[in-house]
């Protein structure tokens, strides 16, 4: 069976959508889960019901909760969660040409003298 190429998503990643929603709402004490979902539904062409688990997962991991517990709380953007501009792509380093290893030399075992037992009387 041939693999089909998946179509590129028509929306940005959930992480960026949630962060822009929280920043766009500009609520002083943080934005609620419902408000974040409404903002995403209004500004992006997505099915929020399908993205709900991903939104919840991102909020748990990257966003600071200011009030309440779970979905009933308010959320603010963590300073670390704000997406930073990516640095210029690094050029891949030239691969070093490995020299073929010479065959390992076999060690010849020297003839050893047999150990003599000491008489302990």
UniProtKB/Swiss-Prot annotation:
Top-rank taxon, per record: Eukaryota
Region ranges (Disordered): 64-121
Pfam families, A to Z: Linker_histone (PF00538)
Localisation: Nucleus; Chromosome
Family annotation (SMART domains): H15
Domain H15: 10-79
One of the GO biological process terms: chromosome condensation
Cellular component GO terms held in the UniProt record: nucleosome; nucleus
GO-annotated molecular function: double-stranded DNA binding; nucleosomal DNA binding
UniProt entry keywords in alphabetical sequence: Chromosome, DNA-binding, Nucleus
Biased composition (Basic residues): 82-121
Entry similarity comment: Belongs to the histone H1/H5 family.
UniProt function note: Histones H1 are necessary for the condensation of nucleosome chains into higher-order structures.
Protein's recorded name: Histone H1A, sperm
Organism: Platynereis dumerilii (Dumeril's clam worm)
């Amino acid at each position: 069976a041939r693999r089909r190429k998946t179509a590129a998503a028509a929306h940005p990643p959930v992480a960026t959508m949630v962060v822009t929603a929280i920043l766009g709402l500009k609520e002083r004490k943080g934005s609620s889960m419902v408000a974040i979902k409404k903002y995403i539904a209004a500004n992006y062409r997505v099915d929020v019901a399908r993205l709900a688990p991903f939104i919840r997962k991102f909020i748990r991991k990257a966003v600071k909760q200011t009030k309440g517990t779970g979905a009933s709380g308010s959320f603010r953007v963590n300073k670390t969660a704000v997406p930073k501009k990516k640095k210029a792509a690094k050029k891949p380093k030239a691969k070093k040409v490995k020299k073929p290893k010479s065959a390992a030399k076999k060690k010849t075992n020297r003839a050893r003298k047999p150990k003599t037992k000491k008489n302990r009387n």
